[in-house]
């Protein structure tokens, strides 16, 4: 596929092609501004591609309504989104026939159930400006919401830089749980977390410049290897 933003002349993605199998983990890596979110925007049909096709189970997303495409995906983004309403309402979010047992099971699965039970009204606690949640707690709630939606495809933004180490481990564990049995697209910031990805797309200046798994890309000793080694050195230091 090829994609150019409206009002510009140079394609930000040019002649890119890949096939993703059900249940695979795809990591999208690159420096800030490399175009990682462009891939997400195209998958979600926020923009139409210039040439080529994006298909889900053989069906061209160009022939699908945007809402139908969105139904196929669960998203957990760096900027967590919660609305004014009870915790239960935030977890169920627009879904029908979700039981209390399912809500509690999802919260337990991601490790946020205990925190919810410590609140004065538990799952009926109304979230507004008077309730202060940490970044990590918000992230875990949105992961529980995604688990409840149970969509076959996932988009995860892995950024956890604004939380402490213990919370980061909780979030990573919850994300791993969420990815089980689902096809996942992970916007990776810490490369150490995506070494087990089935496919890594390496982006720079809007282009996909390398692709392969971790071992293949390290053996190629290119941009990804430099990125990984520099980050690993920083983490060790």
Residue ranges: model-predicted function:
Residues 1-237:
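ABC-type nucleotide-binding domain
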